[in-house]
């Protein structure tokens, strides 16, 4: 989704390369990166070696490093008879300079390939620097000599006999060929045996499978009443009203970022859809909550839900019908992915639990939540063609097993939590656009997972009209088609026309609108106050202006204005203030990674060797800089980092910086000096007793480029010189006698190898993205007001390469349609490290505490007898609504007489009856006429209800063995048995449950968790169902993915 002032204009037909040389933008191995067409914030330094529309060849890098005096390359000019000018054919070939007079000796010394190159070079004019001053006679004489030399060389080569040198050369080449051939044979054999061993190791579906027709909603019992009400309403709607509900009115054509048209005859209102995952975007008097990645770091289910409740409450008070969050795609397959911070962590169970709790919290207020982005939106590069100047968005190619076990798992949990809406993503999946991918939307989401709500597109993610409707899309957002704010929708009047001419069945349109209306009833929004003119309901803020009066249609020039901002304070007050939950989440989401000699927590009654404690604060991440809202959608890295950038952000009502909080943190007098810059001298730290150094790493959505980062990070290092800053401070703090505490604010994992083991680094806190209460929450942990109880939601490796080849962002197009192949996506994050026996710096789930805990007495008890397959899919509890599908008179779809349309506003009306006559449409998607049977894995919300039967209980004793209150996160991992019937690879172990428990010193408590059938199953591609393998499962219980002291069999 673009910034509010986005104006795409015409697309540039060239690419530019960014070679800015600084710590934040330097690319891996010095490679240039493909950069987007939008301008960078701040402005990037453009490379002089931009690739233009004209054809040219770049110099070889090694050749470029040579002196220009050694080589001179001259193209031949060929006259053009058409325009009198010249067309140039350019080739760069180094000029061969004579090092002596023995030309024949030289020719003998070069390879046959070089001889052939010389013979072909006669079409070019090679010259050294002095050639520009040669006379015509000299040039003619030189050409004559060259021809004679070439003739003699050819004769000499014909007469040349074999020599021992020739034989040696042939044997060497033959040996190389044999070695390469043997290596290929060995490689092929190993690949074959690995494939045999893994059995259903799934290769990408290229192209994506098809699944038609789109399943109807209204088949689950707990949605029955809502669908009954929706049926009564939809039955009385006109075709125009149905289309109006399914199509947005256009970008900036309403108060919210997304607005649907109303159905006025049946009194169904326009719906307001608003970002997002961190709070209400573009709204006043709302809370800037900690980001999703910080929430995931709490591993606290209660806080996850409380945060969701507060977000839903604010959306309700602001008149928002649909909140566009939580974000659970990307899941973090690529650690440098730009939007990973919006989600909760790089594990499907952690992501799924956090998503479900957030959704339940949001929807407890009657606000519809949105699970996004479905599916495989793992990187920002090439997600949209118009952002990058390519013809088509990239394709994320993934196998069926990884799709189910990793990427779709959190969405299944969201549907079990009754999420009202699912947003499809920008890119393609297995070479079919996600918002028209019938296998994903119809087959997996609506049939297998039993989704009863509506599917909406990401903003401009819809890339077709008919195919997207048939493929399972229910709502087009924001209504615009292929370009922003041009008033040309792929639906709107085009959907009206397609239904009338039978290209799209009326039955499909009825299901689309029924799903939307049923969700509206499911969360009792029919009881909300009616919007004007009947009441004072609807959105009470404008996304496009901060003034009380503004345009009603900011994307048009119609001149209509009204009071658009009522400044309703939605943040809560007193003990109900949402800042309280924001501070709790930020504090519990802070992860203690290192703590030498109990450096932390700090004492508020501090003193130094000389009496007064001398404290130094280092790094611009400690201070407020220009303020939290200095850049649109937080699209710059300045001051303390409290959020990433993009549509998932929020306008901060305030931001407490670490420096502001530190100024009032100590009870005794301290001498505190702040150096709010990332370049300090040793003298700046030499006289300090305590050095607090702050550094960060930022990223965000692909429509913004900031600091040389085009959405996705270029690497995993700290930005703006943060690593150098830490090394300098840690090496010189107190002339080696002081203590250095490092605080990191980051969107994801950062590589710490250059400083983590320095003796001067005594403690490290990863504060993630803490939101508006950043400084206050940090003080709570830094001074021990609360325990350090955060745990890593991802693995911190020692290098980006350790995460594997498939975890790397594709920075350069590798095909006209960029292809990202995720063949080993099953082994995401810590699973990859386990699979290849790589020791990370800090493993998934890791985090230190200010106290100590002991786990003991693990018991695993069987609750159900094992069976390979779940019970059969149950029959639908209720039948979906049925309607009369008779087409109306096309004349009723024309603009009403005297109607004055708003410029660029998207209407369902037709300007004429052209194209409305029923016709035989012949461009349907592949296999459209083949009806698919129901999936055996379906039958309920989130899948077959049998998958969620509890198979085993896990109990363990947890004791606080320290001297202060603290919280422990108990994590349960499962290792699958080796099924001899179907040989298949499993991850070493996978997270399957967790709980967080708070204990007083010496307190002991038993905690219990359960494992479901799905927890103990894998997705069988052959059977298209979840299968429990035969044999004993190993159950591990501990504190992280690699600290698992207890184990038992099941």
Swiss-Prot record:
Biased composition (Polar residues): 78-87
Pfam families recorded: Fn3-like, Glyco_hydro_3, Glyco_hydro_3_C
Subcellular location(s) of the protein: Cell membrane
Membrane topology term: Single-pass type II membrane protein
Gene Ontology terms for molecular function: beta-glucosidase activity
Catalytic activity: Hydrolysis of terminal, non-reducing beta-D-glucosyl residues with release of beta-D-glucose
Active-site residues, record numbering mapped to chain: 458
Gene Ontology BP annotations: cellulose catabolic process
Sequence ranges of Low complexity compositional bias: 47-56
Membrane-traversing stretches: 175-195
Keyword field: Carbohydrate metabolism, Cell membrane, Cellulose degradation, Glycoprotein, Glycosidase, Hydrolase, Membrane, Polysaccharide degradation, Signal-anchor, Transmembrane, Transmembrane helix
PANTHER family for the chain: BETA-GLUCOSIDASE (PTHR42715), BETA-GLUCOSIDASE E-RELATED (PTHR42715:SF20)
Family recorded in the similarity comment: Belongs to the glycosyl hydrolase 3 family.
Protein's name in the database: Probable beta-glucosidase E
Organism: Aspergillus clavatus (strain ATCC 1007 / CBS 513.65 / DSM 816 / NCTC 3887 / NRRL 1 / QM 1276 / 107)
């Amino acid at each position: 989704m673009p910034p509010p002032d986005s104006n795409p204009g015409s697309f540039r037909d060239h690419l530019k390369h960014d070679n800015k040389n600084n710590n934040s933008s330097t690319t891996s191995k010095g490679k240039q990166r493909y950069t987007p067409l939008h301008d960078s914030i701040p402005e990037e330094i453009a490379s002089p070696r931009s690739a233009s529309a004209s054809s040219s060849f770049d110099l070889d890098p090694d050749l470029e490093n040579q002196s220009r005096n050694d080589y001179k390359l001259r193209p031949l000019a060929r006259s053009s008879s058409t325009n009198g000018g010249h067309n140039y054919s350019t080739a760069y070939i180094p000029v061969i300079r004579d090092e002596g007079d023995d030309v024949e000796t030289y020719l003998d010394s070069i390879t046959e390939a070089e001889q052939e190159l010389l013979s072909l070079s006669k079409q070019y004019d090679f010259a050294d620097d002095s050639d520009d001053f040669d006379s015509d006679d000299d040039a003619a004489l030189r050409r004559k000599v060259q021809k004679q030399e070439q003739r003699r060389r050819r004769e000499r080569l014909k007469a040349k006999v074999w020599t021992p040198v020739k034989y040696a050369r042939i044997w060497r080449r033959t040996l190389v060929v044999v070695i390469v051939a043997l290596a290929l044979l060995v490689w092929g054999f190993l690949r074959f045996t690995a494939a045999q061993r893994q059995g259903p190791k799934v290769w990408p579906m290229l192209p994506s499978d098809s699944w038609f027709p789109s399943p109807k909603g209204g088949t689950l019992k707990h949605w029955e009443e809502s669908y009954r009400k929706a049926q009564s309403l939809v039955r009385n709607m006109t075709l125009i009203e149905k289309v109006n509900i399914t199509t947005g009115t256009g970008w900036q054509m309403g108060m919210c970022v997304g607005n649907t048209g109303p159905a006025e005859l049946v009194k169904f209102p326009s719906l307001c859809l608003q970002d997002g995952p961190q709070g209400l975007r573009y709204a006043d008097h709302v809370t800037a909550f900690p980001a999703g990645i910080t929430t995931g770091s709490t591993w606290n289910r209660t806080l996850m839900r409380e945060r969701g409740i507060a977000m839903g409450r604010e959306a309700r008070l602001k008149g928002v019908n649909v909140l566009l969050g939580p974000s659970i795609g990307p899941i973090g397959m690529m650690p440098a992915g730009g939007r990973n911070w919006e989600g909760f962590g790089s594990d499907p169970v952690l992501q799924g639990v956090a998503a479900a709790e957030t959704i339940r919290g949001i929807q407890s207020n009657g606000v519809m939540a949105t699970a996004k982005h479905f599916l495989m939106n793992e990187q920002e590069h090439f997600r949209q063609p118009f952002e990058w100047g390519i013809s088509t968005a990239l394709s994320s190619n993934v196998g069926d097993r990884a799709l189910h076990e990793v990427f779709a798992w959190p969405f299944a949990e969201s549907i079990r939590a009754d999420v009202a809406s699912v947003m499809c993503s920008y890119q393609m999946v297995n070479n079919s656009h996600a918002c028209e991918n019938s296998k994903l939307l119809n087959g997996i989401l609506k049939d297998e997972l039993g989704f009863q709500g509506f599917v909406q597109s990401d903003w401009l993610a819809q890339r077709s009209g008919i195919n997207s409707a048939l493929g399972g899309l229910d709502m087009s957002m924001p209504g615009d088609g292929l370009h922003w704010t041009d008033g040309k929708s792929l639906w709107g009047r085009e959907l009206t026309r397609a239904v009338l001419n039978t290209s799209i069945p009326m039955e499909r349109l009825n299901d689309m609108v029924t799903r939307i209306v049923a969700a509206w009833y499911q969360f009792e929004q029919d009881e909300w106050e009616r919007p004007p003119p009947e009441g004072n309901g609807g959105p009470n803020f404008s996304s496009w202006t901060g003034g009380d009066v503004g345009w009603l249609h900011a994307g048009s020039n119609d001149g209509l204005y009204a009071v658009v901002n009522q400044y309703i304070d939605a943040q809560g007050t007193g003990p109900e203030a949402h800042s309280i939950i924001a501070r709790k989440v930020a504090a519990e989401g802070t992860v203690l990674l290192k703590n030498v000699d109990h450096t932390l927590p700090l004492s508020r009654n501090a003193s130094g060797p000389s009496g007064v404690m001398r404290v130094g604060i280092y790094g611009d991440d400690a201070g407020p800089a220009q303020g939290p809202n200095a850049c649109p959608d937080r699209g710059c890295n300045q001051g303390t980092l409290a959020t990433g950038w993009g549509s998932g952000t929020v306008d901060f009502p305030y931001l407490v910086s670490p420096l502001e909080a530190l100024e009032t943190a100590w009870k005794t007098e301290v001498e505190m000096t702040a150096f709010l810059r990332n370049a300090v001298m040793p003298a700046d730290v030499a006289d300090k007793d305590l050095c607090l150094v702050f550094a960060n790493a930022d990223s965000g959505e692909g429509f913004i480029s900031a600091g040389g980062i085009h959405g996705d990070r270029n690497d995993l290092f700290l930005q703006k010189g943060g690593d150098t800053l830490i090394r300098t401070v840690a090496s010189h703090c107190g002339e080696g006698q002081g203590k250095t505490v490092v605080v990191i604010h980051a969107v994801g994992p950062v590589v710490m190898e250059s400083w983590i083991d320095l003796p001067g680094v005594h403690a490290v806190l990863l504060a993630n993205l803490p939101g508006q209460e950043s400084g206050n929450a940090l003080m709570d942990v830094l001074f021990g007001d609360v325990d350090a109880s955060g745990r890593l939601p991802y693995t911190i490796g020692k290098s980006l390469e350790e995460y594997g080849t498939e975890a790397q962002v594709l920075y350069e197009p590798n095909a006209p349609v960029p292809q990202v192949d995720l063949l080993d996506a099953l082994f995401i994050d810590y699973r990859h490290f386990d699979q290849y026996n790589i020791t990370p710096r800090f493993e998934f789930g890791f985090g230190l505490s200010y106290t100590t805990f002991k786990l003991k007495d693990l018991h695993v008890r069987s609750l159900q007898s094992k069976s390979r397959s779940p019970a059969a899919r149950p029959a639908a509890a209720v039948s979906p609504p049925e309607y009369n599908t008779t087409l109306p008179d096309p004349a009723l779809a024309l603009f009403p007489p005297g109607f004055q349309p708003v410029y660029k506003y998207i209407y369902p009306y037709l300007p004429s009856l052209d194209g409305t006559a029923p016709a035989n449409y012949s461009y349907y998607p592949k296999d459209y006429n083949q009806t698919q049977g129901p999936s055996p894995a379906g039958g309920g919300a989130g899948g077959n209800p049998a998958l969620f039967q509890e198979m085993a209980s896990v109990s363990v004793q947890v004791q606080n063995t320290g001297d202060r209150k603290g919280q422990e996160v108990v994590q349960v991992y499962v290792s699958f048995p080796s099924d001899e019937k179907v040989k298949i690879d499993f991850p070493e172990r996978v997270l399957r449950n967790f709980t967080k428990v708070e204990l007083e010193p010496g307190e002991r408590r038993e905690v219990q968790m359960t494992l479901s059938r799905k927890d103990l199953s894998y997705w069988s591609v052959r059977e298209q169902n979840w299968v429990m393998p035969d044999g004993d499962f190993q159950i591990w219980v501990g504190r992280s993915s690699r600290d698992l002291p207890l184990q038992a069999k099941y």
